[in-house]
Amino acid sequence: MTAILITGYRSFEIGIFDHKDPRVSIIKQAIRKDLIGYLENGVDWFIFTGNLGFEQWALEVANELKEEYPLQIGTIFLFETHGDRWNEKNQEVLSQFRAVDFVKYYFPNYEQPTQFSQYYQFLLEKTEGAYVFYDTENETNLKYFLKKAKDMPHYQLLLLTFDRLNDMSQS
């Protein structure tokens, strides 16, 4: 079994507030290309954390690819209460994350800040690599996860950056 964690910017972090935003189409094209590359190299599990934005779009693409490839999808939420306060539209997305092949949560609820570090360490230990939509020009809390990932020998990181997206949109 080979599992890849998929994570990245949440929609509000990159100023996308509408699913019909033309940038979503370009991002999904890049996702499709990269996920197919993973599948053709033996990856059989895609793991998500259940966030809106990049993960949501990647989940949609992964579900489409299930028709062509033998793949499994898992969601490991940080907390059991993840998304409970989201609006109705976002609850529909949350239900898609809960309708995958494997669903778990790491903690029942928030108790202390160290839970985040423990969660990321768990994800790193249970996956062989990560596909991350992230650019150092637009930092978020993902920088802590990426630092841990880069410190792990043999952990494979594939970054989708704004430069890669610009190249794709021009071709």
From Swiss-Prot:
Signal peptide: none annotated. It holds the Pfam family YpsA. It comes from the Bacteria. InterPro entries: YspA (IPR010697). Gene3D superfamilies: 3.40.50.450. HAMAP family: UPF0398 (MF_01575). PANTHER family: UPF0398 PROTEIN SPR0331, UPF0398 PROTEIN YPSA. Belongs to the UPF0398 family. This is UPF0398 protein M6_Spy1399. The lineage of its organism: Bacteria, Bacillati, Bacillota, Bacilli, Lactobacillales.
